[in-house]
Amino acid sequence: MKNTAADSRANRNIMLLTYVVLAAFVGLMGYFGYFLQVKSEEVINSSYNARLDRFSDRICRGRIYSRDGQVLAETQVDAQGQELRVYPFGAVFSHVVGHSSRGKTGLESLGNFYLLTSHVNLLEQVWDQLSGQKSPGDSLVTTLDAGLQMTAYQALGDRKGAVVALEPGTGKILAMVSKPDYDPNPASLDLVWDALVDEENNEGQLLNRAMQGLYPPGSIFKIVTALEAMREHPDTYREYSFDCSGVYYLEDYSIRCYHSNAHGLQNLDLAFANSCNGAFASLGLELDLAAMHDLAEQLLFNCELPLSLPYAKSAYSMEAGAGTWEILQTSIGQGTTQVTPMHMAMLTAAIANGGTLMKPYVIEQVQNAAGEEVKRFLPVSAQNLMTAQESRQLGELMVQVVERGTGSALRDAAYSSAGKTGSAEFETGKETHAWFTGYAPAEEPQIVVTVIVEEGGSGGGCAAPIARQMFDQYLLTMSE
C-alpha cells in the first residue's frame, strides 16, 4: 500500500510537470507565432539591430519611388563595383525620404527592412550567391506626389517652415517639406555634416519641422475653442456676441487683434472668419476649463500620435483653476500650447472626413525588382475625433474664413475650400509665425494642406497663398 501511494504521488508529480512543460511549450510557440506575424519586422528593422546592415553584404539596397513613378532614391554601382546611394531630387525630399549614410532617417530608416529584403525568384537568388553578385533589394512605392512636393518646396522658397499635404479619406501623405533643408547625396552630405551637427548650429537643417517642429498654434487653435463652445452650447453657440474695438481689456490685461484691427460686432461665425482675438479670449472665459482640457486630449494633444515616422508630441497644459491671463492666452492659441504641422494636418483631415481620423501613412506598397507587388499598405481608421455633425459645423466656419474672412487668398479659386489662418506670437520684437490649415474642395474634400512659415507675418498674407498653390497643383494642374 505504501508503494502504491508513493507511486500515485510520483505519477501526479510527473503529470503536473508534463502539463507545466506542455503549457510552457504552447506559450513559447504562441509567442513565436506572434513574433513572426507582428513583432519580427519591428525588431529586425530597429535601429538598435546591428545585424540588419549585414544584409547589405548580399543585397543591393532597393529603390524608393514617388506614387507617380519618379525615382526618389536608388543605388548606383560604378565600374569598380562601388555602391553609391543617389537622390535625384536632392534636397526636395530630404526630410521625408531621408538619407542612408551617416545613419538612417526618414523612409530610408522606416523602410530599411524592405529595402534590404529581396523577393527575386529562388533560382536568381541562388545564381547571385554562386556568382558572388548581390540580389536586388525590394523597392518602396510611396504615397508622395513628386509634382505636389516640388510645388510645396518652391512655394516655401528660402523661408523656414513646413508644408504637409494629406488625403483625408485615406491618410496618404501626399507631400512633406521642411526648411531649411540639406542635400542627402553622400558627397554633399559628407562636406557639411560637421556643420549640421555642430551644437552651435541653430538652423536645424536636420530637423523635420513638419513632424518634429513644435510651434504655438495661434489662431488655428480657435478650431478647438470653437468646438468646445459647440459642445457646451449646441443650440445657442451661434448666438454668441462680442463687440470688438481692436483691443480687449480685462483687469490689467489686454488682448489685441492682429494690428489692433477693430472688427465691430461679431457673432461666432464672424469672429472665426475674421480671427478676432478679443472675441475668442472672451469666449474662453465662459468655457469649462476641465472639459476644454479633456477635449484637447481627445484631439491628441499630450498624446501619442498614430504615426510611423519620428514626431514630437503636441502640448496643452491649461486645467481647471487656471488664472485669467492663461485662459485669455490659451483660448487664442498662445501661452504654453504647442503643436506640430502634421498634428494640425491630422486634425484638419478629421474635420474634412466627417470626424474620423485616418492613420497617416507614406508607404503605398513594396515591389520586387521586377516591379511585382510584394506587400500593399491599406488605409486604416485611427479613431473618431468628433461627431459628423461637429465636423460639419466646423467645416461651415472654415468655409466662412475663405468666403468673407482672412482666407481671401483662396476666394477666387476655381474650386471651393475651407480653412483657418493663424498668426502666432513666439518672441517679443519678432514677426509672428504664419499658419494656414485647410482642405479642398469644401464639399467633397480631396486634399488637406497645412502650412507654417516661421516669422512669416499674417497667415492670410503668407501661408494661405502657399496652400492656394498646393490646391491649384493638385486639383487643377494634375487633373488636366
Residue ranges and their predicted role:
Residues 2-6, 68, 169, 173-219, ...:
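Beta-lactam-recognizing serine transpeptidase/beta-lactamase-like catalytic domain environment
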Residues 1-193, 205, 214, 240, ...:
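Periplasmic/cell-envelope proteins involved in peptidoglycan metabolism and beta-lactam response
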